[in-house]
A protein has these predicted regions:
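Flexible, polar/acidic helix-loop-strand segments at domain edges
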Residues: 326-391, 558
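Bacterial Sec-dependent N-terminal signal peptides
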Residues: 1-27
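Acidic, serine/threonine/proline-rich low-complexity intrinsically disordered regions
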Residues: 149-150, 162, 214-233, 385, ...
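Conserved, well-structured interaction surfaces
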Residues: 39-54, 74-140, 156-170, 174-192, ...
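An aromatic- and glycine-enriched ligand-binding surface/loop that stacks and positions planar moieties
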Residues: 20-76, 143, 147, 177-178, ...
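Long, intrinsically disordered, low-complexity segments
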Residues: 94-97, 171-173, 255-314, 381, ...
Length: 559
């Protein structure tokens, strides 16, 4: 961690630095004596949060750690082959941002501004500190909670031991409560993409639900899961019933394109802003290669496709609308939740290089959600903004938190959460208590299902299976791809593909992996594992243990 300070201006904010070599101390053209005096100085200091975003706040990323997506090769976290790293940006990058926050929080007191102005920028710094502390807790559990600016690589703070996660999460709540009080409403944010009161409240929802369910299902000693769930419920209740600043965008498909950008889309809660729409790709515009990666790398697993309901509101193991046998690729879309056809490509749709042909790019289901054909065809890069938090997350998190807290949810609460998401896509069947009882469903499972299908490829699935403590069940299972039909695949590729498909009612290599023939097997269960004793937390990078003087201890089971 000490190497991070080679990237921080000792005694300054380093506003002139866009990037840095972690092994070099950058020169400074700005001293503390000349800074921290005006509102413009505070604004410039906080702008750094938006100039150098990483992790979930960075560009578009496709999370291959779970059973949701598969890339060109196996993911070491998903298949259980990961080992203890020497160093890792998963640790250092969040801490870097936390140290920037702490620097601002200490030195903003020098500025000759009103308390209201100062508190606005303190709130911004505290939002990002909470965001990154939570990012660390999700991965590592207990972490060193460093709450001061460090201007010396020998500062004792860099050797502090791990702080209990409960204490770190409480600090996140304190920071976000302050942020929610002092940040402007989203309607009055000066610069679009900067954090608002809504973003702070939504983070309270996210953290409260995560920590509450993590404590509940992992049975953490000393943790009060209901306390955290109540934090989520209360914050969501404010957003939904008091502030009322947000609503769902009417078009799910367009939500992830340029049409869904900006203030006019009230589903946007916190976005990572890139360049102007259809911006040329050059050094003056920030772009990303999301659509290009979707063509070259990303495939949605059959494991996820099977979770989509049929239009009667029933899952595939209960619905009479399920076809007895799929005869072609597009049969999987028959009578399904409309979001399925908005998430993956159907055969014949205009896609990467003309009409989409199954198995021509990947051996799973090719991701359609968020793909922008025009940018891919002309630029191989795009500038569409990334939604870090959207209002749909608040709605479904409210439903889940209510059920986990109370053990039940009312039809009215379902109607303003789960059923709002369904109405947006014109899903015929609504979720009610009577429907669940009549068909022998599990309400919690249906709420979780709704979250999963709504947020395919939005970096939710891995965190969800970790907090629900079902990773030990879903990650060691086969990863399945698309159904192979000789009518859908060109030429001689069929014989090669047939070596990896299920036969005789879902058998592969002598084991039953699903209930259908001709399903492509992306990864076998024999090639996947999950050790519940250790894999629910990341291993601490070895260098961080050494740099702390062994005060930071390794997570259980990692060596």
């Amino acid at each position: 961690m000490k190497r991070l300070y080679n990237c921080l201006m000792i005694g300054t904010v380093a506003l002139t630095i866009v990037g840095c070599d972690l092994d070099m101390m950058p020169e400074t053209t700005m001293t503390d004596a000349a800074f921290w005096k005006t509102e413009n100085d505070l604004r410039g200091a906080c702008n750094r949060f938006y100039q150098q975003m990483t992790g979930e706040l960075g560009g578009f990323s496709h999370d291959y750690r779970s059973d949701e997506l598969r890339g060109n090769s196996a993911n070491s976290i998903s298949d259980g082959s990961w080992t203890v790293p020497s160093t890792s940006g998963n640790w250092t990058n969040p801490y870097w941002r936390i140290f920037i926050s702490n620097n601002i929080l200490e030195k903003a007191e020098r500025a000759n501004v009103t308390d209201a102005i100062r508190n606005k920028y303190l709130a911004e710094a505290r939002f990002f500190r909470a965001f990154h502390f939570f990012e660390l807790v999700k991965k590592y559990g207990d972490i060193p909670m460093i709450m001061k600016a460090v201007d010396d690589t020998k500062d004792p703070a860099l050797s502090m031991p791990r702080t209990p996660r409960e204490q770190v999460i409480q600090q996140c709540y304190d920071d976000l409560d302050f942020a929610a009080e002092w940040l402007p409403d989203i309607d009055h944010v000066d610069t679009w993409g900067h954090v608002s009161r809504s973003a702070a409240l939504a983070m309270l929802v996210r953290i409260g639900l995560y920590e509450g369910t993590y404590i509940k299902y992992h049975k953490l000693q000393g943790g009060d899961y209901k306390f955290h769930l109540k934090r989520a419920i209360d914050a969501a209740d404010i957003m939904m019933h008091i502030d009322k600043k947000h609503k769902l965008y009417p078009d799910f498909q367009a939500l992830f394109t340029y049409d869904g950008e900006g203030r006019q889309n009230q589903e946007n809660v916190f976005v990572r802003v890139f360049g102007p729409n259809e911006a040329p790709v050059n050094t003056n515009n920030q772009t990303h290669g999301n659509s290009r990666e979707m063509e070259n790398t990303v495939t949605v697993t059959r494991n996820m496709v099977d979770l989509f309901l049929y239009t009667d509101g029933l899952p595939r193991d209960k619905s009479p609308l399920k076809l007895s046998h799929e005869t072609c690729f597009n049969d999987v879309f028959e009578n399904r939740d409309p979001r399925l056809a908005m998430t993956i490509y159907e055969k014949g749709e205009e896609a990467y290089k003309g009409a989409y042909t199954p198995f021509s790019f990947r051996n799973g289901y090719n991701l359609k959600k968020g793909f922008i054909l025009k940018d891919w065809a002309s630029l191989y890069a795009e500038a569409v903004d990334k939604m870090v938090i959207r209002y749909a997350e608040v709605l479904i998190s409210y439903a889940e938190s209510l059920y986990e807290y109370n053990g039940y949810i009312t039809d009215q609460q379902l109607d303003e959460t789960v059923n709002e998401l369904r109405r947006r896509v014109k899903m015929p069947a609504m979720l009610t208590n009577a429907f669940v009882k009549e068909h022998g469903l599990d309400m919690l499972e249906e709420i979780r299902r709704e979250r999963t299908v709504e947020f395919i490829d939005e970096n939710k699935r891995y965190d969800d299976i970790i907090r629900w403590k079902i990773a030990e069940k879903v990650l060691p299972a086969c990863l399945l791809g698309a159904r192979l039909s000789t009518n859908d695949v060109e030429g001689g590729k069929v014989d090669e593909l047939k070596k990896r498909i299920t036969l005789n009612g879902g058998m592969f290599n002598g084991k039953k992996v699903c209930d259908e023939d001709s399903i492509y097997v992306l990864e076998t269960a024999e090639d996947r594992r999950f050790d519940a004793r250790k894999d629910y937390l990341y291993p601490i990078p070895l260098q961080e243990i050494t740099l702390s003087g062994n005060n930071v201890t390794q997570n259980v089971g990692w060596y």
